[in-house]
Design a protein with these regions (language model features):
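Mature, structured domains of secreted/extracytosolic soluble proteins
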Residues: 2-229
């Protein structure tokens, strides 16, 4: 059963708005980095001599199903965006993005020292919470929602290799999460979640998409977790 809209505003964005935003981002990129022309039409030395910047590389089994190449929302297009804006372009993170907005925690994703975001997929939220419980979290229990989101935030912008090398990290909720390397460019978190597309580089943050909701809230989702009638 398809879950109805449960956020203060639509959890998805019209294609026209996305396309307009993409065109605006391209135009801004061209102004900032593209032609580098002076008033006399001569390319600036910085623009003429700069080497092309390597495109961000994401890894994990879900990456092939997410925007890539020249698609809006591809890793390179998201690289300079604020985290809360970048989340809107990732189609498997509509619930997480809605939770960030509903909780009022967008500013927490723009911390000066950076942040690592362990973002569960929509399927992960559906497996964890019933539709009624998820509605309640998003619309009526802001404190619990903020606590849940802090279970998925780590201070500092850390790549997947950084997390694996550390072996464990502490979330903003104060929970210690173990991190072990896995195959196919993935990692295992808290012995229950795997990264499925890691290393989105956005402004001041890294986004790692994971397949399980972290934290200790009770599980009410799954096959029996549909909305009560």
């Amino acid at each position: 059963m398809k879950r109805p809209v449960i956020t203060p505003r639509s959890r998805t964005f019209p294609r026209l708005r996305r396309r307009t935003a993409a065109l605006a981002a391209v135009a801004l990129s061209l102004v900032l980095t593209g032609t580098g022309c002076s008033g006399g039409g001569t390319p600036s030395p910085a623009a003429a001599g700069a080497a092309p910047k390597a495109a961000p590389v994401v890894s994990g089994p879900l990456c092939d199903l997410l925007p890539s190449g020249s698609d809006p929302g591809n890793p390179a297009a998201l690289a300079g965006q604020p985290a809360e804006a970048a989340l809107q372009w990732l189609p498997v993170l509509t619930t997480f993005e809605a939770a960030v907005r509903a909780s009022g925690m967008s500013a927490d994703l723009r911390g000066g020292s950076g942040v690592t975001i362990l973002a569960p997929t929509d399927d992960a939220f559906a497996a964890k919470f019933s539709e009624d419980d998820l509605d309640h979290l998003l619309l009526a229990d802001r404190d619990t929602l903020r606590g849940l989101l802090r279970e998925h935030l780590v201070a500092g912008s850390r790549s997947l290799s950084d997390l694996v090398a550390a072996g464990k990290v502490t979330t903003l909720a104060g929970t210690t999460v173990t991190v072990t390397g896995g195959g196919g460019g993935s990692a295992r978190l808290a012995d229950r979640a795997d990264t499925v597309c890691a290393d989105y580089q956005v402004a001041g943050a890294r986004i790692h998409i994971i397949n399980h909701v972290l934290g200790n809230l009770p599980t009410t989702g799954g096959p029996g977790g549909h909305r009560a009638h």
